[in-house]
């Protein structure tokens, strides 16, 4: 990933500048995942992730992971489903949505647009269960 550390605070800047790119990307991915899990809203995660996005390659894995976490948080908040973004998302995100989504609408969209037959079938099944339980 690209190194631009001037907007990134202390330890994060050191991590991004680490010469061992594979290790740095692995640690940064873990950091992004743990922060996304801890920060409740899409807005709070976006505020935390802004300097990270400014420091990494826009087309790289870390930027994609941040964008996918942002999409997941938006989907969890009940906002409208971006069908194209959900369809284009990675298997990782689609599996996460199937496992954790509380919205039958989100799951129904994924049931139509999922990347794999397994994801589509699981999403349809969960959507049906949520509808049957009145959620």
Predicted regions: what they are:
Residues 1-135:
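Alpha-helical scaffold segments
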């Amino acid at each position: 990933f690209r190194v631009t550390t001037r907007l990134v605070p202390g330890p994060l800047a050191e991590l991004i500048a680490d010469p061992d790119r594979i290790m740095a990307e692995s640690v940064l991915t873990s950091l992004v995942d743990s922060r996304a899990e801890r920060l409740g809203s899409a807005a709070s995660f976006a505020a935390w992730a802004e300097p990270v996005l400014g420091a990494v390659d826009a087309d790289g894995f870390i930027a994609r992971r941040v964008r996918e976490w942002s999409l997941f948080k938006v989907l969890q908040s009940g906002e409208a489903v971006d069908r194209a973004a959900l369809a284009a998302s990675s298997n990782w995100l689609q599996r996460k949505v199937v496992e954790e989504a509380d919205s039958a609408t989100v799951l129904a969209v994924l049931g139509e647009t999922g990347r794999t037959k397994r994801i589509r079938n699981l999403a349809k099944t969960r959507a049906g269960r949520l509808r049957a339980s009145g959620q």
